Amino acid sequence: MKVWLCLGAVVLLAALATTTVTGQRGGAFRESRDHPAIRYSDGPRHDAVTALDRAVQAGEVALVFEPTSGYLRSVLEALDVPVESQLTVFSETSFQAHRINPENPRAIYFNDTVAVGWVRGGDVLEVASLDPTQGVLFFSIDQQPTDRPQIRRNDQCLACHLSWDTLGVPGLLTFSTLPMPDDPNAYAVGWVTDHRSPLQERWGSWYVTGAPPSVRHLGNTTEPIEYVPGASTDPTPALDTLEGLFDLRGYPTPYSDLVALLVLEHRTHMTNLLVRMGWETRVADYEAARAGRPPADQAAAIR
């Protein structure tokens, strides 16, 4: 991370100040993720999830399958992801959307470099892992009992996790989504949030525990909301626990904590920013080498 910050600052600041003649939205990486300097699809990987898969296939680590949660607890333990980070969201914003609802919310767990998504009854565990050079990689683990489950790359996730909202690099994002009415013709309404978003615009279709009643937000409401951007929102239920809202079997903890939500939203934008800085610098150094110029860090020192 420190290397990215040192090498990437000049390149990123220049890119942020530039508007392209093609009319592309600014502030995003514009090269291919498989640019020779990046090689996102086939470059070497050194992330925690890839290391775990190698250990599992070598028989050095055993992942234990449980009837309700599958490999969830075992994977969290192996990757040192705390169960206290659990967040629950019932918007259908996953490729396992057909299984997600207020009575069966998707659970998300995270640490500094890994995020794990679990849907009770789902076919796979969803895993995102921050590689020191490649950025955020996406994986899935089949929720079927076997001696050595494989952790496979899953670029299907890039349909949502590679966009302008992730700064043009494979990255992380959180949505605030208004609960859907019971109408098959209704359209989902939502927007990306991070640490810069007003609290009153955050957490639509998320359960939020531990928030004081004075904090206005869009969480804890499963009924359709008449929402006007910028307008004051009605108070939502203040929850101390998830108990009584839905069947908690399989969930390691009965919480979806406010503090964990705040940390995750800060992490998403910061992760994407650091990845983009790294990619911008590598492309700049690659092009400089082809042209016989010094790399970006040396050029900055010369100036």
Question: Predicted segments — roles?
Answer:
Residues M1-W4:
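Positively charged n-region of N-terminal signal peptides that target proteins for export
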Residues L7-A17:
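Bacterial N-terminal signal peptides
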Residues G26-G122:
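N-terminal alpha-helical interaction blocks
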Residues Q24, N111, G117-R303:
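Sequence context surrounding c-type heme c attachment/ligation sites in exported
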Residues T19-G23:
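Sec/Tat signal peptide C-region and signal peptidase I cleavage site
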